Curated annotation (Swiss-Prot):
Active site: 145
Organism of derivation: Chlorobium phaeobacteroides (strain DSM 266 / SMG 266 / 2430)
Main location: membrane
UniProt-listed CDD domains: M48B_HtpX_like
Gene that this sequence comes from: htpX
CC cofactor: Zn(2+)
Its membrane topology: Multi-pass membrane protein
Protein name per its UniProtKB record: Protease HtpX homolog
Protein family according to the UniProt entry: Belongs to the peptidase M48B family.
């Protein structure tokens, strides 16, 4: 669950920084100097929107390591680490992928995969998961994460987020301009945006950004089903994945940092719309009904 929420929070932070920078540099004054230039605004929104999204993608692996304190296994220190690295290597070869970095972090049961591309990825598992599951179940979890990489889920979510960012920036500024025009005095003929524009655009950018996360989480839930199915294919059997999900259902799944929530093996939210993962029961049912 970690992967997506980390991506969302990083994306929001980058977007706000880029937006503020654009204001400081006078881009908004250029766009609104002689009325709102819709064409230029849309181009500006796309540049900032996709730029922020891809910057977040490039930072994803570094941010994941930092936020969890994950330790990349350079030289396995014990038999468990040897097995972990070998298992990820075998699964990656089956999927036709380059070997990802393998990491361990302290925490309750969970795991995640992230990275800017299939050839520069990271698979991390918690000490809690390694201690509470048997090796067949852990292998299934690793297969699920490798399937995420193979499916290109981070790039897919980046493109979705880029489109949503574009609309967030565009709509927030259109509405902010309308509010500013309404509040502006009839005697003000400067044409420059006032304080109402600055405040409104920031407020609406945050509000629409939160609403956009609902769409991202919807796609994240769909990708979880695909990763479960991909794990079953890599293992040649759906039962280990089902057993792993059932085991997770009986454990207190680890809460990954908010910014990483959507890339874990387990996750969810208080509200279904903001949940990065489907219910475990639904995932098990989907695997059991698959042919």
């Amino acid at each position: 669950m970690k992967r997506v929420v980390l991506f969302l929070f990083t994306n929001l932070a980058v977007m706000l920084v880029l937006s503020v920078s654009a204001r400081v540099l006078g881009v908004d004054r250029f766009l609104t100097g002689n009325g709102l230039d819709m064409g230029m605004l849309l181009l500006f929104a796309a540049l900032i929107g996709f730029g922020g999204s891809f910057i977040s993608l490039l930072m994803s692996k570094t941010m994941a390591k930092w936020s969890t304190g994950a330790r990349v296994i350079q030289q396995p220190a014990n038999q468990n680490e040897v097995w972990l690295v070998d298992t990820v290597s075998q699964l990656s070869k089956k999927a036709g992928l380059a070997m990802p970095e393998v990491a361990i972090y302290d925490g309750a049961p969970n795991a995640f995969a992230t990275g800017p591309s299939k050839s520069r990825s990271l698979v991390a598992v918690s000490t809690g998961l390694l201690q509470s599951m048997d090796r067949k179940q852990v292998e299934a979890v690793l297969a699920h994460e490798v399937a995420h990489i193979d499916n290109g889920d981070m790039v897919t979510l980046t493109l979705i987020q880029g489109v949503l960012n574009t609309f967030v920036i565009f709509l927030s500024r259109v509405i902010a301009y309308a509010i500013d025009s309404f509040l502006r005095s009839d005697d003000d003929e400067s044409g420059s945006p006032g304080i109402g524009y600055w405040i409104s655009s920031i407020i609406f950018e945050i509000m629409f950004g939160i609403l956009a996360s609902v769409v991202v989480m919807y796609f994240s839930r769909k990708r979880e089903y695909r990763a479960d199915a991909g794990a079953a294919v890599l293992l040649g059997d759906r039962r280990p994945m089902i057993d792993a999900l059932r085991a997770l259902g009986g454990l207190q799944a680890g809460q990954l940092p908010k910014e990483m929530a959507a890339s874990g093996i387990a996750g969810g939210g208080m509200m279904a719309l903001f949940s990065s993962h489907p219910p475990l029961e639904s995932r098990i049912a989907a695997l059991e009904s698959a042919r």
